[in-house]
Amino acid sequence: MSEDALASKRRADEEGSAEGSAPGKDDRAPSKRPRNTTSTTTGIPTVSGVVSSLGTNRVSSGSPTSSSAAAGAGGGPRTIVTFNLNGGGPRLTNNWEELAAFLEENTADLVCFQEFRLPAKGVPKCKKDDDTGRKRGQLKDDTAADRKDIALLQKTLMKLARRLGYRVLMSLANYKYAGTAVLIRCDDTPDGRGVRADTCPAVDVFYNITEDGELVKKHDREGRVIAIEYPSMTVVMLYVPNNGVKPESFKRREQWDSVLRGFVNGYVKRTGRTLVITGDLNVAHTDADLTHPSYFKGMFPAATPRNSGQPGCTPAEKERHSLLLESGGGLVDAYRHLHPVAAAAAGGSAGTNTEGITWRGTAGNQVAASGRYYGKGMRIDYFLVSKSLAARIKEVKVFGRGADREGFLGSDHSPLMLTLLPSS
């Protein structure tokens, strides 16, 4: 068995996911976080001081006129990229040149990464199940391997972010698992490029959600949430846990989905703000979002039919996603808004549905076609927007395509970019 195959098997054993390279590769959901809505002054987390602390958990340019000027131009990002890296370390090591070229060519106002998979700082020699003293916005730094990860991040993503005018914020798990990061475009860039006229600095950043509609500063234990409040909209980036194949993982995912629906309903009711929810939501809503519907639906029979099938396309997950779209006055799947499901695609015979697929299976070691999921894929990465934003959806670009994952930049997920028209 190859080193890659061993690593894949080890992750599956540790995380309880379905055998093989299945989307998401985990079935854990975080425990419900306690409410904590008090403002903090702990400073934005840094990586060895590379990103300067801004004094509070606010991201701003320091210009007293920037927010008001931006609000006049819409008060929020017009271009957002979401990308499940399938490991920050591997992408920064093996695919940095193509990832850097992608970020330079597509200078989005906000870039959202999932599966960043770098460990959070804790007390010296802490074990992976030890939450003591965890600083989830900073990298673990007490071993030579940790310091190597920090050096890698500094010379790649952090260096590029400074040049392009981004702040880098992270939310990390205890070990190389899950985790998220964002690049937020600001207007105090070293090279004077400045923020574009159609965007603005973020107002505030949060790291978890509650079922009653609150954004909170305390990080999700597995680093699955980063939410950014702009003057006129809130962007919530999520890495949703995989449904798994065991009853306990079904229950955890059901709880996660319930909390998310509660958050959307409560937040919109309380604030009236426009929402964009993006990231790896780990669900293919309809058969049109699967390359091989019959194959996926025939996988992993469960005691309850509602939980039978490949994680990501079980009846229970699809039903809950439909309920999410009805939450908060209604959310619009931006890709499907522009690309409605054709009647012919609804049945979804094998290999028929290929457009918009965001996750693709891995090729076999010796023969590509021997890979369990090779040639198969799902659309599980999304931009869900409030109905009031639907008229502004200009484009949702899925950069990757095909069984051989062209444009996937080394990941098993494709990057996506949402472009919004200017507000009237």
Residue spans for each PLM region:
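N-terminal, active-site-proximal structural segment of metallo-dependent hydrolase catalytic domains
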Residues: S2-L160, R167-T180, D412, S423-S424
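Metal-dependent phosphoester-hydrolase catalytic domains
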Residues: D4-L6, R10-G16, K25-D26, P30-T37, ...
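Active-site beta-strand/loop signature of hydrolases that rely on acidic residues for catalysis
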Residues: I80-L85, F102-P124, V235, V264-A288, ...
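Short catalytic/ligand-binding loop motif for oxyanion handling, primarily in non-cytosolic enzymes
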Residues: G89-P90, P119-V123, Y177-T180, D191, ...
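Short amphipathic alpha-helical segment that frequently serves as the phosphate-/nucleotide-binding helix
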Residues: T93-A100, R253-R261, P415
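Catalytic-core regions built around general acid/base machinery
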Residues: F102, T156-R163, V259-Y267, R320-L324
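Structured beta-strand-rich core segments of catalytic domains in phosphoester-bond hydrolases
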Residues: R117, G122-V245
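Surface-exposed cleft-lining segments at the edges of enzyme active sites
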Residues: Y207-V216, V240-D257, R261-V264, N307-G309
